[in-house]
C-alpha cells in the first residue's frame, strides 16, 4: 500500500506518541522535508534530539519526545502565503496569538512563520505545531 502523505503521517505519529507518553518514536519513511520539519521543531523546543537511521530503503528517523506538543499536523493543500498574510493563517491554524508555530517552505528553506515575517518572504504552508 502506498503512503499518500508521509509528512502528515509523521506528524500524526508524533502527536499520538506524545499523547500516550512515549519517550521516543520511529518515523518511516524518512525524507528531506520531514528532516527539515523535525529540525525546525527541535530549534523551537518541541522535540529533543533526532537522528537518521539508514535501513537500506528510505530510512528511519528516531525522534526523542519531551512532552511539549499538544497538536501537530500537516496543512493540506499547501497554501501559498504572501509575507503580509501570515496573521490570517495564524488565526486559522493556531489556538492563540504567539502560541505555536506555522512551518513554511520558502525559497530560502524551511522555517517558521516568525522567521519568514522577519525576512519579509512568503512561501507555502506545510505544517503547524503547538
Curated annotation (Swiss-Prot):
SUPFAM superfamilies: Ribosomal protein S8. It comes from the Archaea. GO terms for cellular component: ribonucleoprotein complex; ribosome. GO terms for molecular function: rRNA binding; structural constituent of ribosome. Signal peptide: none annotated. GO terms for biological process: translation. Pfam families: Ribosomal_S8. Keywords: Ribonucleoprotein, Ribosomal protein, RNA-binding, rRNA-binding. The keyword rRNA-binding applies. InterPro entries: Ribosomal_uS8, Ribosomal_uS8_CS, Ribosomal_uS8_sf. Part of the 30S ribosomal subunit. One of the primary rRNA binding proteins, it binds directly to 16S rRNA central domain where it helps coordinate assembly of the platform of the 30S subunit. Belongs to the universal ribosomal protein uS8 family. This is Small ribosomal subunit protein uS8.
Amino acid at each position: 500500500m502506498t503512503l499518500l502523505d508521509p509528512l502528515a503521517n509523521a506528524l500524526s505519529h508524533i502527536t499520538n506518541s506524545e499523547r500516550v507518553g512515549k519517550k521516543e518514536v520511529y518515523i518511516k519513511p524518512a525524507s528531506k522535508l520531514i528532516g527539515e520539519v523535525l529540525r525546525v521543531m527541535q530549534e523551537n523546543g518541541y522535540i529533543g534530539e533526532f537522528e537518521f537511521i539508514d535501513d537500506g530503503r528510505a530510512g528511519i528517523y528516531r525522534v526523542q519526545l519531551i512532552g511539549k506538543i499538544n497538536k501537530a499536523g500537516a496543512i493540506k493543500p499547501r497554501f501559498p502565503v504572501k509575507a503580509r498574510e501570515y496573521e490570517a493563517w495564524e488565526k486559522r491554524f493556531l489556538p492563540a496569538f504567539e502560541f505555536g508555530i506555522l512551518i513554511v517552505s520558502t525559497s530560502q528553506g524551511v522555517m517558521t512563520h516568525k522567521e519568514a515575517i522577519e525576512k519579509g518572504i512568503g512561501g507555502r504552508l506545510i505544517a503547524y505545531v503547538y
